[in-house]
């Protein structure tokens, strides 16, 4: 069953290839959605796809790429959103 989740990632997550790395992992897990920088220095990640793959993506978000220092990941389920790819914005 396809579902959508939104993650708000706090910490040192901008300027460390967090969005690009998120895109690579999302593609690996067959997820669509997006990763975008927020003005407060955090990153927002929308993940759409099979729930077991989203769970894997969330585990990755809790660590991030090597240069990142993730402090917190707040995740909530959101209404299904149809996306055909994983975008960086």
What is the meaning of each model-derived region?
Residues 1-89:
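Intrinsically disordered, low-complexity, mixed-charge
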């Amino acid at each position: 069953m396809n579902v959508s989740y939104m993650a708000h990632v706090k910490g040192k997550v901008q300027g460390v290839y967090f969005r690009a790395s998120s895109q690579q992992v999302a593609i690996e897990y067959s997820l669509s959605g997006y990763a975008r920088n927020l003005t407060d220095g955090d990153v927002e990640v929308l993940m759409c796809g099979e729930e077991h793959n989203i769970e894997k993506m969330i585990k990755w978000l809790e660590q991030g790429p090597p240069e990142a220092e993730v402090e917190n990941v707040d995740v909530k389920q959101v209404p299904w959103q149809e996306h055909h790819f994983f975008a960086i914005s």
